[in-house]
Amino acid sequence: MIIVLSPAKSLDYETPPHVSHHTLPQFADDAAALIDELRRLSPQQIGTLMSISDPLARLNFQRYADWSRTSTPANAKQAVLAFNGDVYEGLDARSLSPDDLDYAQRHVRVLSGLYGLLRPLDLLQPYRLEMGTRFTNARGKDLYAFWGERITHALNAELKTREGASRVLVNCASAEYFKSVKPKLLDARVVTPVFEDWKDGRYKIISFHAKRARGLMARYVVEGRIGSPDVLKDFASEGYAFDEAASNDDTFVFRRRAGA
C-alpha cells in the first residue's frame, strides 16, 4: 500500500533534521530542466505567474538561481522534514522514529510540481512551484503536460513490487496534485479518504482541518504499519470516525463534530 500526499508551500530549513539518512529524488533531471526554464523569468513574471507578492516573487527568483543539480545536506533537507504546512503538522515527521521514517520511505510518496514524485527522505532544495501553475514549458502548456504519465509509471513500478492485495494507492493528496496521476493507468485500487467537520448544520470539508487530517492519516499508516485499506476505517485521530453510510468502496468518509 502506498499513500500519496501533496507538498507544502511553507518550508522549514531552520530546524536541524533528527536523522542523517537521505536519498536523492528520482526525477532530479526533470526538476533541473524545469529550473532552467524558470530561471528565464524575472521576479515580476514569477509574481504574475504564481499570483504571489513581490517579496515572495523575489525570494523564489533567488531560490531558482541558487538551486543546484547536486543536492547535499548542505543545500537541501529530507522532504518530509522540510515541508511545513497543515498536512505536515498532522504528520509531524520530526517526532517519528528512524524506524518509522524507514517505513514511510517505502510507503509514503509526495507529489511535487518541481520534483514530480518524492520519497520522504529525498533531499529537497527550497522551491515553490505548485502543480496547478500554468507554466508553459518545453513539454506543453502546464505542469500536467510536463509530467505526463511519468508520475503514474513511477507509482506503478513501485506498486508492482507489492503483493496483489497490497496494490492499493491511498489518495491523501489534493485534487490539484492528484490530477498529475492517471488513475485509469494505475495497476492498483485507489482509495480516497475524505474528512468532514460539522459546521452550520451539516458536514462539510473545511480545508485546514482536512489537510491536517490527511497528515494524521499518513502518520496512522506509518506508526501502525498498515497494509490493508480496511484497517484505515479504524482511524480515529482527533475525534474523526469512519462513517460507513456516507462511504463506498473507493471513498472512505470520516466525520467529526466540534468537541468530539
From Swiss-Prot:
This is UPF0246 protein BTH_I1090. HAMAP family: UPF0246. It comes from Burkholderia thailandensis (strain ATCC 700388 / DSM 13276 / CCUG 48851 / CIP 106301 / E264). Belongs to the UPF0246 family. Disulfide bonds: none annotated. PANTHER family: PEROXIDE STRESS RESISTANCE PROTEIN YAAA, PEROXIDE STRESS RESPONSE PROTEIN YAAA. It comes from the Bacteria. One of its GO terms (biological process) is response to hydroperoxide. Pfam families: H2O2_YaaD. GO terms for cellular component: cytosol. InterPro entries: YaaA (IPR005583).
